[in-house]
Amino acid sequence: MSEEDTRLTARSGYQPQFSWSYLQPKYWLIWLGIFGLILLAFVPFRLRDKLASYIGKIVARKAQKQRHRAKINLQYCFPHWTEAQREQTIEEMFVIVTQVMLGIGEIAIRSKRHLQRRSCFTGLEHIHRAREQGKNIILLVPHAWAIDASGIILHTHGMPMTSMYNPHRNPLVDWLWTFARQRFGGKMHARQNGIKPFLNHVKQGDMGYYLPDEDYGAELSVFVDFFATYKATLPGINKIARLAKAAVIPMFPRYNALSGKYEIEIHPAMTLSDDPEQAARAMNQEIESFVTATPAQYVWILRLLKTRKDGTDIYA
């Protein structure tokens, strides 16, 4: 990205452009996949989810690296679980992610009204209350499988979002998915531009989408409790909230295959300590509260516990 492009995206949001090179043969398989997702967008969810369940069980057997990471994470976070409990959660997780992925076309192209019918909220009053108090809003959103879908759905309910984003390595996928994320007015910001563009849009009234559970290493993090273990956690949420003059409201999206709906649970605004470690621990407590109820909805395949105090690689 050129310096001029960097300045542009810092002001207006990340905006990759279409290139005629995307029609070259090397991209044809991606276009074929996109066509398949578009077709699935109009298939009844029960039929689509049945297909996804079948595929997800196959993926669960084939994706050994991802399965290994999930197993390690669950062993550390839930040492009291039996091996059977961990295996069942992993199997359910792969089914859920496949259901969400096969439904991406629906999220990307169907109408506002359709997406509104396919979603429901609990705790929406916490957002309304913060607005009534004149506060900006930062949503604290752990890595659930339905995280992208919920961001787009919020737009359809008149709640514009802004978020930071790592551009996809494949430029065609990057262009397509950014277009889908922003089609109702959302703003994505490339992480290389820093946090300032994100904060500026929060101050202008967009709700910030903040992911609290990524591991950025020991130098940028503090070690605080996370389930039954500990985690390198970014400590700056209290400072970010202060700079944005925002309430920090935890939110967790789930996909319910029984109803075919995206269920978005919202908690009351957090009371954040001025102490960075206490604020970081409070974030992890919110994650624990959401995930414990439905562990298979969480993205356990991430290297969530990558940074350890003794420098060991638990995923090796």
Please give the residue ranges for each predicted region.
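Catalytic core of membrane glycerolipid acyltransferases/transacylases, capturing the structured
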Residues: 99, 133-192, 218-225, 229, ...
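General small-molecule cofactor/ligand-binding pocket signal
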Residues: 120, 189, 267
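Membrane-anchoring hydrophobic helices of lipid-metabolizing enzymes
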Residues: 2-141, 174-176, 185
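Non-catalytic C-terminal accessory region of glycerolipid acyltransferases
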Residues: 2-8, 14-17, 24, 88, ...
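Short Gly/charged-rich anion-binding patches and loops
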Residues: 35, 69, 125, 149, ...
